[in-house]
């Protein structure tokens, strides 16, 4: 299971899926921080994704590189402590290029509830599923 989190530490760009009116919505997000089994993200409060998450916090993410893909799902929460917000802003330089200060964004966490780890390299392919 930890190899799935390690994979996302190395491959931070993920497809980030939300649901609105029973329809899927995808966009590319970057995993900003991982602590334990919690993933952290940041976005603008003006973006559609923020509104979607406040209306329905269920999300699924998918990261892929080569023959390996990792899918995780759970519910988003917006109660990220200020210390973690500042850490995210300080350690992800893309944010300071886009936003004037750490508090110009909203931060959210995903407490992962399910993981699928796929590796198509071995024969037969490896699929590991974890419910947390």
Feature names for model-found ranges:
Residues 1, 43-46, 93:
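Charged, amphipathic alpha-helical segments
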Residues 30-31, 107:
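Short, surface-exposed charged micro-motifs
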Residues 32-67:
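A short mixed-secondary-structure module that forms the rim of ligand-binding clefts
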Residues 71-132:
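Charged, gly/pro-rich active-site loop segments
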């Amino acid at each position: 299971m930890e190899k799935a989190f390690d994979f996302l530490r190395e491959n931070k760009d993920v497809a980030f899926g939300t649901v609105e009116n029973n329809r899927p919505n995808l966009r590319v997000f970057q995993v900003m921080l991982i602590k334990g089994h919690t993933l952290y993200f940041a976005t603008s409060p003006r973006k559609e994704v923020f509104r979607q998450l406040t209306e329905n916090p269920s999300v699924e993410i998918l990261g892929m590189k080569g023959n390996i893909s990792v899918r995780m799902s759970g519910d988003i929460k917006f109660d990220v402590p200020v210390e973690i917000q500042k850490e995210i802003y300080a350690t992800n330089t893309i944010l300071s290029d886009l936003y004037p200060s750490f508090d110009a964004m909203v931060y959210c966490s995903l407490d992962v509830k399910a993981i699928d780890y796929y590796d198509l390299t071995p024969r037969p392919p490896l699929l590991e599923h974890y419910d947390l």
